[in-house]
Protein backbone atom coordinates (compact mmCIF):
# COMPACT_ATOMS: atom_id res chain seq x y z
CA UNK A 1 0.00 0.00 0.00
CA UNK A 2 1.42 3.36 -1.03
CA UNK A 3 0.66 6.33 1.21
CA UNK A 4 -0.59 9.70 0.07
CA UNK A 5 1.73 12.70 0.42
CA UNK A 6 -1.21 15.02 1.14
CA UNK A 7 -2.35 12.88 4.08
CA UNK A 8 1.01 13.24 5.82
CA UNK A 9 1.29 16.92 4.92
CA UNK A 10 -2.08 17.28 6.64
CA UNK A 11 -0.68 15.70 9.80
CA UNK A 12 2.37 17.95 9.65
CA UNK A 13 0.15 21.01 9.17
CA UNK A 14 -1.66 20.03 12.38
CA UNK A 15 1.69 20.21 14.20
CA UNK A 16 2.40 23.66 12.70
CA UNK A 17 -1.10 24.87 13.60
CA UNK A 18 -0.56 23.72 17.19
CA UNK A 19 2.65 25.81 17.31
CA UNK A 20 0.82 28.78 15.78
CA UNK A 21 -2.16 28.51 18.13
CA UNK A 22 -0.25 27.50 21.26
CA UNK A 23 -2.30 24.28 21.40
CA UNK A 24 -0.50 21.88 23.74
CA UNK A 25 -3.33 19.32 23.56
CA UNK A 26 -3.09 19.02 19.78
CA UNK A 27 0.68 18.66 20.00
CA UNK A 28 0.32 16.10 22.78
CA UNK A 29 -1.95 13.97 20.58
CA UNK A 30 0.27 14.24 17.48
CA UNK A 31 3.60 13.31 19.10
CA UNK A 32 4.49 9.81 20.30
CA UNK A 33 5.45 9.38 23.94
CA UNK A 34 8.98 8.48 22.79
CA UNK A 35 9.19 11.40 20.32
CA UNK A 36 12.69 12.67 19.56
CA UNK A 37 13.34 16.06 18.00
CA UNK A 38 16.76 17.13 16.73
CA UNK A 39 17.12 20.89 16.55
CA UNK A 40 19.84 23.50 16.46
CA UNK A 41 19.40 23.76 20.27
CA UNK A 42 19.90 20.01 20.81
CA UNK A 43 17.74 16.97 21.43
CA UNK A 44 14.10 17.37 22.45
CA UNK A 45 11.61 14.97 24.02
CA UNK A 46 7.83 15.17 23.78
CA UNK A 47 7.79 16.98 27.13
CA UNK A 48 10.38 19.49 25.89
CA UNK A 49 8.33 20.11 22.76
CA UNK A 50 5.17 20.69 24.81
CA UNK A 51 7.04 23.04 27.16
CA UNK A 52 7.71 25.34 24.19
CA UNK A 53 3.98 26.14 24.20
CA UNK A 54 3.80 26.91 27.92
CA UNK A 55 3.35 30.63 27.24
CA UNK A 56 1.29 30.27 24.07
CA UNK A 57 2.13 30.35 20.36
CA UNK A 58 5.75 30.24 19.22
CA UNK A 59 5.17 31.12 15.56
CA UNK A 60 2.95 33.72 13.93
CA UNK A 61 2.87 32.19 10.43
CA UNK A 62 4.40 29.43 8.33
CA UNK A 63 4.44 28.11 4.79
CA UNK A 64 5.30 24.60 3.68
CA UNK A 65 7.27 24.28 0.45
CA UNK A 66 8.50 21.37 -1.66
CA UNK A 67 7.94 18.00 -0.03
CA UNK A 68 8.74 14.35 -0.51
CA UNK A 69 7.38 11.20 1.12
CA UNK A 70 9.30 7.94 1.52
CA UNK A 71 7.46 4.87 2.77
CA UNK A 72 9.90 3.09 5.10
CA UNK A 73 7.55 0.22 5.97
CA UNK A 74 3.79 -0.39 5.95
CA UNK A 75 3.57 1.38 9.33
CA UNK A 76 6.30 4.06 9.00
CA UNK A 77 6.82 6.98 6.62
CA UNK A 78 9.36 9.75 6.30
CA UNK A 79 8.17 13.20 5.21
CA UNK A 80 10.82 15.70 4.15
CA UNK A 81 9.99 19.27 3.19
CA UNK A 82 11.04 22.89 3.29
CA UNK A 83 9.19 25.46 5.36
CA UNK A 84 9.45 29.11 6.24
CA UNK A 85 8.17 30.24 9.60
CA UNK A 86 8.10 33.45 11.58
CA UNK A 87 9.11 32.59 15.14
CA UNK A 88 8.06 34.63 18.17
CA UNK A 89 9.64 35.03 21.61
CA UNK A 90 13.27 34.64 20.71
CA UNK A 91 16.14 37.09 21.03
CA UNK A 92 14.90 39.18 18.10
CA UNK A 93 11.20 38.81 18.97
CA UNK A 94 10.24 37.92 15.37
CA UNK A 95 12.51 36.03 13.02
CA UNK A 96 11.64 34.48 9.69
CA UNK A 97 13.52 31.22 9.21
CA UNK A 98 13.92 28.79 6.34
CA UNK A 99 13.98 25.17 7.51
CA UNK A 100 14.46 21.78 5.92
CA UNK A 101 12.54 19.24 7.98
CA UNK A 102 12.29 15.48 8.10
CA UNK A 103 9.49 13.99 10.19
CA UNK A 104 8.98 10.29 10.68
CA UNK A 105 5.41 9.16 11.27
CA UNK A 106 4.46 5.73 12.62
CA UNK A 107 1.08 4.07 12.87
CA UNK A 108 0.58 2.87 16.43
CA UNK A 109 -2.72 1.45 17.67
CA UNK A 110 -4.37 2.56 14.39
CA UNK A 111 -3.25 6.17 14.90
CA UNK A 112 -0.45 8.03 13.10
CA UNK A 113 1.98 9.77 15.47
CA UNK A 114 5.16 11.74 14.89
CA UNK A 115 8.06 9.77 16.38
CA UNK A 116 11.01 11.82 15.07
CA UNK A 117 11.65 15.25 13.61
CA UNK A 118 14.86 16.96 12.55
CA UNK A 119 15.02 20.61 11.51
CA UNK A 120 17.96 22.02 9.58
CA UNK A 121 18.21 25.76 9.20
CA UNK A 122 18.62 26.89 5.60
CA UNK A 123 20.13 29.98 4.05
CA UNK A 124 17.66 32.69 3.16
CA UNK A 125 17.67 36.22 1.82
CA UNK A 126 14.95 37.58 4.14
Describe each model-derived feature in a short phrase.
Residues 2-29, 34-126:
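A beta-strand edge to alpha-helix "cap/lid" segment located at domain peripheries
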Amino acid sequence: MKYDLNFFLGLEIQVWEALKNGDKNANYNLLSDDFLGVYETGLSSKEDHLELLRNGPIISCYEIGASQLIQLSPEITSLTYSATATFLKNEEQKTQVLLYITSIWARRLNKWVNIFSQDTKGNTHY
